[in-house]
Amino acid sequence: MAKETTDGYELYARQIYNAFKNESEILVKILDLLFEIAKSDGIIKSEELNYLEVVSKIFNLDEKTFRQLFAQHKSEGNPYEILGVKSTDDFEEIQRVWKQMVKNNHPDKLIGKGMPIEFINTANHRLAAINSAFEEIKNLNKL
């Protein structure tokens, strides 16, 4: 049943939020995993995206975080969206944001916290998307 529908998910999302409301980093990782599950059939469908957006709101995550995660999981993510920066930002600011994201999303950090392998695998994918976006921005700006 759970594989076929998202009915009743709000209750579970609230329970997760209550368990980790003071650890937004974990809530972001959980939402990241849910994005991975949603795209497991190759594309994130509109109803799945709606579900993920509701979960994000229940988790009290900001819109920027949601957009970044979505951009990282789209097959053609905008590199600026992935990093949560604007194309008009100067390169030093973009690089600062990239370094902070690498630090916050590095798998070794999760390993040190004893996180499950699923979190670590997702962190590897996320870090690859972050690094790829930064490289694409460097190439676009011929740096």
Regions found by a protein language model. Give the residues of each.
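Small-residue-enriched hydrophobic alpha-helices in membranes
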Residues: 1-39, 46-143
